[in-house]
């Protein structure tokens, strides 16, 4: 460990296996270090003087970096090795869906998205998303329906507040619970505009939202949300 600096030593693995409370404590300490601006290196001791070292999370991607990632020539198909097993049926639900963001400041207790993508929301530009949609329209299997436009939370199209871009997420409070933070920017106008632009593409019949929608965030915004619900969310059968 001589070369590992500014690290937080977690509970030893062998002890956590025997104590659920220690496991929960370790999980909480890991959760407190998921922010790229304040998170430390984490070290988990194992037997025989072995250690697992996790570096701090990477900084959020810029919009240009997000666009560059999604401009790569993805195949929208499963690997051919799955053919012998009949393919991947679940792919049909997401094949013609569009990722518009990553990250989530919802902080649901049951959810691990903060560990995967962080609390600072990163977004693609309209141009990047529209270009991908136009490519989908050209595919023979496309029937005119975009199944989803979203991410961890569909209606988050930017960081919760300006502070998150330079300081990261607040370590001791949530953006939406127990009540929305006064600094949170609740605004669906950009998202509604994006949905309209997608719907206007020749060959697109309907645009749906299947990613989760934060209703407390919707209620914090007094504009445009009715149109969002009326046009783009399937009615229950």
Q: Model-derived features: where do they sit?
A:
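Flexible, acidic/Gly-rich N-terminal and inter-domain linker regions that tether
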Residues: 1-94
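Glycine- and acidic
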Residues: 50-52, 80-83, 93-98, 109-120, ...
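Short helix/loop capping segments that flank catalytic or ligand/cofactor-binding pockets
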Residues: 52-56, 62-64, 77-80, 107-110, ...
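Flexible, glycine/threonine-enriched loop-and-boundary segments that flank and lead into catalytic domains
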Residues: 78-95, 210-229
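N-terminal pre-triad scaffold of radical SAM enzymes
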Residues: 83-112, 130, 143-145, 234
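Structured alpha-helical segments in the cores of large, soluble enzyme domains
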Residues: 96-108, 191-200, 227-230
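Core AdoMet radical
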Residues: 115-222, 234
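Residue-level detector of conserved catalytic or cofactor/ligand-binding positions
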Residues: 229-237
């Amino acid at each position: 460990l001589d070369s590992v600096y500014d690290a937080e030593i977690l509970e030893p693995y062998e002890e956590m296996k025997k104590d659920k409370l220690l496991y929960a404590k370790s999980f909480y300490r890991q959760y407190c270090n998921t922010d790229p601006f304040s998170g430390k290196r984490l070290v988990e001791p194992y037997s025989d003087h072995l250690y697992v070292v996790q570096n701090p999370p990477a900084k959020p991607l810029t919009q240009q970096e997000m666009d560059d990632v999604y401009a790569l020539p993805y195949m929208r198909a499963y690997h051919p090795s799955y053919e012998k097993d009949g393919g991947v049926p679940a792919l049909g639900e997401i094949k013609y869906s569009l990722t518009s963001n990553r990250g989530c400041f919802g902080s649901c207790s049951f959810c691990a998205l903060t560990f995967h993508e962080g609390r600072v929301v990163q977004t693609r530009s309209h141009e990047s998303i529209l270009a991908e949609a136009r490519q989908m329209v050209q595919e023979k299997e496309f029937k005119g329906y975009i199944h989803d436009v979203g991410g961890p939370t569909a209606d988050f199209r930017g960081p919760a507040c300006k502070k998150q871009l330079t300081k990261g997420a607040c370590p001791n409070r949530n953006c939406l619970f127990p009540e929305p933070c006064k600094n949170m920017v609740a605004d669906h106008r950009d998202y509604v505009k994006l949905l309209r632009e997608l719907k206007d593409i020749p060959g697109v019949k309907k645009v749906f939202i299947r990613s989760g929608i934060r209703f407390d965030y919707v209620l914090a915004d007094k504009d445009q949300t009715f149109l969002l619900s009326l046009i783009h969310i399937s009615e229950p059968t």
